[in-house]
Amino acid sequence: MKKSLIAAAVVAALPAFAQAQTNVTMYGIVDASVNVIDLGDNSRNALIIGHGTQSTSRWGVRGSEDLGGGLKAVFQLEAGIANDTGAHDAQFFQRTAQVGLQGGFGTIKIGRGYTPAFRMHGTWDALSYGLFNNLLTATVPIAAGGADTAVTRFSNGIYYDSPSFGGITVNAAYASGETTDEALERSAGEGWDISIGYKGGPLHIGGYYEQTKDAVANETERFGIGGGYDFGAFRLVAGYSEREEDGFDKYSAASIGGVMKLGTGSIHAQVIRLGNDNLPDADATAFALAYVHPLSKRTNLYAHFGTTRNDDNGTFGMRTGAESFLADAPGSDVKGFGVGIRHVF
């Protein structure tokens, strides 16, 4: 009830706030789909009304204040919406909650936001973190059927984005574990990562390294490298990412994909080889095919198909922008197809 009242108060205040501060913008995405999902031989096919399928449904406010001398104050607050039920995230501004400074030195922000690793990983995704078997299939946690090759967000974080130096950019982040218990290591709960990218003409390449520690300071390392080339009517992307944890063998994801223009729309295709070295015959191959058709600059329709074919002991699933679909048993294949609409405001 408290969260509902807070949300209502924030929304009610936005028009007056935006009028008083013309550099404040309210924005959002509403994305809905109708899908048929098959989780394997031990489950029946199901009709799923999806939310956030191409892009996670959300609303937010962002803005800036000119402080003079080329310096700006910037902020962003963003909340997720499950528009199939009307529910919102348990943490109200779970997606982004940041404030910082921007200038010739780059941008420094404090709060909760996307990690440089996650942002870099998405640059070699042919489906831009949306639709069946986008690269979230690789980055989501193992319990959600993924390979956990990049942490999506840090809380309690400090973020730095550099300006471009001849097409080269550097992004870094540190998250405090805020550990005060003397019985625990100081580094418990911490995380940090760095990404370096280059973009020049039709070529973009980049990589990242990430290290996180759990509540008892067990360490997990992640890295990735990839890029793409835009030929005009066709864009090719490819990459490799890996996760390794203390006491466990690695998980990995190798992908190749492409985007081809077709009239006013575009065809997207991608193949991901998902690896699990902890068990024999536990890998999987994920495939995606989609068509996106714009109706305007802000509204588009889409149709998509995806399948994840697990080896005998594989438990990998399939992911859209906001939802994970898990195999019903080791070795089961997951597949689905559907259509949807996305509106950006």
Pin down the residues of each PLM region.
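Outer membrane beta-barrel
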Residues: 21-36, 46-177, 188, 197-201, ...
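Outer-membrane beta-barrel architecture
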Residues: 9, 60-62, 98-100, 159-161, ...
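Gram-negative bacterial Sec-dependent N-terminal signal peptides
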Residues: 1-20
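Detector for outer-membrane/organellar transmembrane beta-barrel domains
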Residues: 187, 191-294, 304-307
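Outer-membrane beta-barrel "beta-signal"
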Residues: 165, 329-345
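Outer-membrane beta-barrel channels and translocator barrels
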Residues: 15, 21, 66-68, 104-106, ...
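Residues that define the transmembrane beta-barrel architecture of outer-membrane proteins
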Residues: 4, 45-57, 92-95, 152-156, ...
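Transmembrane beta-strands of outer-membrane beta-barrel proteins
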Residues: 24-32, 69, 73-77, 108, ...
